[in-house]
Amino acid sequence: MEGVMAKNKWNIAVIGCSGMGKQHILGALKNEKAVLYAICDSAPERLKPFKDEFAPEVAVTDYRELVNDPKLDAVILVVPDQLHLEMSVAFLRAGKAVLCEKPMALSLEECEKMIAVERETGGKLMIGQVCRFTPAFVMAKELISSGRIGELTFVESEYAHNYTGARGYNDWRVVPERHGFIGGGCHAVDLLRWIAGDPTEVFGYANHKGLPDWPTDDTAIAVYKFPNDVMGKVFVSIGCRRNYTMRSVFYGTKGTIICDNKSEHLTLFETDESGSHSSYTVPKLIPIKLADHNTTGEIEMFLDALTEGKPMPVSSVEGASTVAVCVATVEATKSGVPVQIRYPV
């Protein structure tokens, strides 16, 4: 079967009965275009409570039972990153639309295989880079695009998330190929790419002190060359001892934006109409509507694109490009020299 037929109501399957899986289920249930048709998890003890709570028509422990189900229209993959390639390819070849959680995959080569199958089948593949639907970050992008802070000079974001005790079911996060900069740091990288464009070069440092029993560095900092002579920085730590944050700052020639995905306001510094420098010391606090994980907005955009026959809001190439930057960053921290970033074709 080639392509995805547009319709007004979509039978959805959520693969992965985890905390994030539940967020996606709740997001689907809030959408009038979605029907929670099926759920799947390889662990029966994780599947049963979801089956009892949400009562889907189908509940299975093997995703392959859903691949050729004629009643299924689209799947949301909330599974370990190592499974993204295998599952995405299977569902795309069966003519199902796919919303795959971030990161798209753990290597650029895997991403390119997914892109190739999407193109070959005429399928629909969206990557769940949820920061693009976060109200504060959406507003920051709008303010920057409108020229509110002038021309960008420097951008920075951080992903500080204590992974102590967060090894994942069957330790799926604790594998050598899942570096924290790829698995979690892709959020911050994707945000800066979305706002400042594709960086061309990266240099970075990393250490391994916070989670010594994990197989990869747990703290890293990277500096990027962005288009238009904009510089950027991303800090990632999965071994930190603090509450979660994605604090991000955007510096421009006329002002500065400070925001994150947990605060109830965005902070804006800007020059007033008279050009007064005093305005820099008096920030404007712009109220922000918080949305937990923003999966509701993400799913809404996914289904709207399917219904209207439009391109995916976060395309496979976009998802792969973020992975490309993350992979190059890990390489830079290991080699000790700047790395030129290779993007997907």
Predicted regions and their residues:
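Short glycine/proline- and charge-enriched loop/turn segments
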Residues: 95, 169-177, 276-285
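Beta-strand-loop-alpha-helix segment that lines the small-molecule cofactor/substrate pocket
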Residues: 2-6, 74-132, 147
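N-terminal Rossmann-like dinucleotide-binding module
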Residues: 2-54
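Conserved SAM-binding strand-loop segment of SAM-dependent methyltransferases
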Residues: 56-63
